[in-house]
Amino acid sequence: MDIPRIFTISESEHRIHNPFTEEKYATLGRVLRMKPGTRILDLGSGSGEMLCTWARDHGITGTGIDMSSLFTAQAKRRAEELGVSERVHFIHNDAAGYVANEKCDVAACVGATWIAGGFAGAEELLAQSLKPGGIMLIGEPYWRQLPATEEIAQACGVSSTSDFLTLPGLVGAFDDLGYDVVEMVLADQEGWDRYEAAKWLTMRRWLEANPDDDFAAEVRAELNIAPKRYVTYARECFGWGVFALIAR
């Protein structure tokens, strides 16, 4: 059980597996006004940066679930590095369908709503682990600029323009699902650059170290196209944000 190898390779040096920066996560943690002891469930927790830094800065406790064995190991090391391994725990498992044994104050799926078929499915899943009145965090892409054609959308790495909504459309969809949007923090292009461009050096170094690997041709093909594809299409078209929701 693991994520596709191209992601394990290209994001192996990432601490954050989405377009947020450390500063954006710090802002999000601050605006949520969490008290020490706040219990958080994070589905698709990646390398654990959100839970680990919030445990350090806000005294939260939490559990992260991720199907990447590499990222889960990195999350555990990060918790030890920050001295919070008694507060946050990371489990290598498929987050799809995961429900916490004990209800949480905050239930999050930040950039991994695909585990439940999209943000609506993620909301249904997270709601099962959330205390009444608790905060749900959904991290989701949106169109900053709607692609003019389906071909441009596909060049952005999605199958169709219908895969994502605009920002007003996304906020409206949360409203339609019966949630108040009580906070949001949006990524900026600097965060997108750090997320995407960091992959390129990682892939290049991996190719240098593994020239005879059976997967090298696929990594080389991705590195050949990724920079131009990103700056031509995705950088201008994509937005991304984390939205804090409370059920009405």
UniProtKB/Swiss-Prot annotation:
Cellular compartments annotated: Membrane
An annotated GO cellular component: membrane
Protein origin, superkingdom: Bacteria
The keyword Acetylation belongs to this UniProt entry's keyword annotation: no
Topology versus the membrane: Single-pass membrane protein
Matches recorded under InterPro entries: Methyltranfer_dom, Pre_MeTrfase_YjhP, SAM-dependent_MTases_sf
Name the record gives this protein: Uncharacterized protein YjhP
